[in-house]
Amino acid sequence: MGFSLSNFTSDPFAISTVSFGIMAWVVAIAGAASSKQENFPHFSWWGISYQIVIILIIFVLYANNNIELYKFTLVGLVSIAFIYTTNSTNNLIYNSNSAGNLCCAAGCILLSILNLIWILYFGGHPESPTNQFIDSFSLRGQGHEQLGSGSHNHNANNANNNIPIGAGNAIIGKGEMSPYDDRFAASGVNQPTSESLRLASGPQMGNGPFTTTGAIINPNLQQPLSGSIGGSAHHTPTNINNNNNNNTGYMTSSHLTGLENFSSPHVPGSGTGAGLGVGAGRDLTHNSNGGGGSGGGPASANNSNNTNKRNTIYTDSETGTGITFRYKAKALYSYDANPDDINEISFVKDEILEVDDIDGKWWQARRANGQVGICPSNYVKLLDT
């Protein structure tokens, strides 16, 4: 999680209540310091000291983004502070006419009001009307630095350093990212060309007749020459001439997620499509061990090896992005994604989402239609599974 002032400043309720509490406490401590000590209730000093400790604790919890984990503890602590401030107010008003005592009493009255608000909010259920009204003022357009201790911004700033192809993002120029679902990566529609793909430096192709871990993006052909196409991952020739070594990028086998179904006329056993398209008549839902689709190897391969076919439609535990969604959450409110942030997803109230990476104020989420993105954690509630 980590300490970050942005976690505190992004919550209007936290800013307003903590700021109000500090001002009220300054009024109370100023009145206590200016009053005659023989007429001042000595126990009120402890109540004033206890109150500033509670204010600092709440500030630290908001800054560390774990206020939700200590709400019930805070209810008990703030309730004690409420008793102290109300008792001090009674003693200061009715037992002395000192100006300092009355000033301290005014500060204690303000602190009592603040403590009552905190008790109602921290002790209330997230779906209660009061909590829903307060949470409705939360900022939507913040920079999402809270996700995984700022990993959202860190990954966006370093997008050009190491982005695996088919992992849900492609680089369109410098720093711009365009999401697309890996399940449609083989369609050849709206796919970046090889000129626009910038890959991190990977292992070079071997010198032997075959390779098992490489794939070449040939800028002249504008299509991948993959080592895992059509089930023939171990039979990609390496003696293919490349006329432009400067524009050639290399991918390891871990980068091939989502490119398995790409076809190329230069690779044995693949379809006959060009560019990033699909081979003619290629069956995208099943692959056989024989290395041929209906666009490559013999047609009998798909008929005789039905038991060896693999369904390439992703299951609940295989999303194409390498994320396993371990939790389910219910949307407490409807949310419209920020059009300027391609990573956000929209959802409606009471919709059931699959979530993961639940640290921070922004969680990884997947809708029922398969859309993957991030959602604000204060708009959803984890369900018991």
Swiss-Prot record:
Segments of skewed composition (Low complexity): 299-308
Matches recorded under InterPro entries: SH3-like_dom_sf, SH3_domain, Sho1_SH3
Domain SH3: 324-385
Gly residues bias locations: 270-280, 289-298
Regions of this protein lying in the Extracellular compartment: 34-42, 87-101
PANTHER family xref list: FCH AND DOUBLE SH3 DOMAINS PROTEIN, HIGH OSMOLARITY SIGNALING PROTEIN SHO1
Function summary: Plasma membrane osmosensor that activates the high osmolarity glycerol (HOG) MAPK signaling pathway in response to high osmolarity. Mediates resistance to oxidative stress. Controls the activation of the CEK1 MAP kinase. Influences the molecular weight and polymer distribution of cell wall mannan. Involvoved in invasive filamentation into semi-solid medium and plays a role in morphological dimorphic transition which is a differentiation program characteristic of C.albicans and which is known to play a major role in pathogenesis.
Subunit structure: Forms homooligomers.
Protein name: High osmolarity signaling protein SHO1
Organism field: Candida albicans (strain WO-1) (Yeast)
Taxon lineage: Eukaryota, Fungi, Dikarya, Ascomycota, Saccharomycotina
